[in-house]
């Protein structure tokens, strides 16, 4: 099959309003003076697309976007970064969120759930046409991407997804968890991460499950075994954790689509995620392939020296 796209990213296009707050959780008060409030394009699908493209993978983004100013910001972001964007009209308006960012880089995200409607769909003919020329699909959990999963399977694509802060029981996430070959999930809301990881693999198609754990690194389930993925020291001070999970997924997929072992892919992801933590919430910079591979070589050399 001839392909012109390495990764087709579905969903996750939106705009965030970034509010820097003095602390999290934010104590109740009638008002606060904050350093600044800024709006910028970039939610999970956008960041994965940006990360993949920066790593040299041919990337195409498909999602529903509104005919509004927020939608214009998304269109401009993709145009400026040279990432093809196929947009389907979203009658309820472009997806939006407010991110409260604390001094330590942690964030609290508030998502506007009024934008999507039950009848929203990505047209089957559009999904099929883009899938026919793609190697792999990364599917965001935003509505209505779940309806596209069978079409991607019919096209023979491998699939990845990020369940974010799934609690392991919410049924909304299950189609994504069970239809993907590579599953990313945060440990934040999981009572028993190992149990959830194994259930994902047992009940679905996943060959690899990665549970990211912030400053603790990540956990990788591959070939029936769970191993710890050490955190990578960021190349600069940590400013904001926003987008770190998306960067991890992008780095991992670079390795996976290159045929690297899962453990090696996870190192790619850890390096990309560490870089993302040094980027302000208002920014959209991603690590490039050369920088990632150079950092990987440094880590390999350090490990070899320690074992000598």
Predicted regions span which residues?
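Glycine-rich phosphate/adenosyl-contacting loop at the front of the ribokinase-like
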Residues: 1-62, 307-308
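Conserved phosphate-binding/catalytic region of the ribokinase-like
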Residues: 1-7, 33, 197-308
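A glycine-rich beta-to-alpha transition motif near the start of alpha/beta enzyme domains, typified by
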Residues: 58-86
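Short, glycine/acidic-enriched capping/hinge loops at junctions between secondary-structure elements
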Residues: 18-23, 72-73, 149-150
């Amino acid at each position: 099959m001839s392909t012109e796209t390495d990764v087709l990213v579905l969903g996750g296009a939106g705009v965030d309003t970034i509010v820097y707050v003095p602390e999290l959780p934010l104590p109740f008060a009638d008002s606060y003076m904050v350093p600044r409030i800024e709006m910028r394009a970039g939610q999970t699908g956008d960041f994965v697309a940006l990360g993949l493209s920066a790593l040299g993978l041919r990337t195409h983004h498909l999602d529903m976007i509104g005919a509004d100013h927020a939608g214009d910001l998304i269109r401009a972001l993709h145009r400026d970064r040279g990432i093809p964007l196929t947009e389907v009209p979203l009658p309820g308006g472009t997806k939006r969120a407010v991110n409260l960012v604390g001094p330590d880089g942690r964030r609290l995200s508030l998502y506007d759930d009024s934008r999507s409607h039950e009848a929203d769909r990505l047209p089957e003919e559009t999904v099929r046409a883009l899938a026919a020329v793609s190697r792999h699909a990364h599917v965001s959990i935003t509505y209505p991407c779940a309806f596209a999963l069978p079409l991607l399977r019919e096209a023979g694509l491998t699939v990845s997804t990020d369940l974010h802060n799934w609690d392991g029981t919410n049924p909304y996430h299950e189609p994504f968890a069970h239809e993907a070959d590579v599953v990313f999930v945060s440990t934040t809301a999981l009572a028993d991460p190992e149990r959830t990881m194994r259930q994902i693999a047992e009940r679905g198609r996943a060959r690899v499950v990665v549970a990211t754990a912030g400053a603790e690194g990540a956990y990788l389930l591959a070939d029936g075994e769970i191993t710890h993925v050490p955190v990578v020291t960021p190349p600069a001070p940590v400013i904001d954790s926003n987008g770190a999970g998306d960067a991890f997924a992008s780095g991992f997929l670079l390795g996976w689509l290159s045929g690297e072992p899962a453990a090696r892919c996870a190192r790619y992801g850890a390096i990309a995620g560490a870089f993302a933590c040094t980027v302000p919430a208002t920014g959209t910079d991603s690590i490039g392939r050369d920088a990632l591979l150079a950092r990987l070589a440094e880590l390999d050399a350090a490990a070899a020296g320690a074992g000598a």
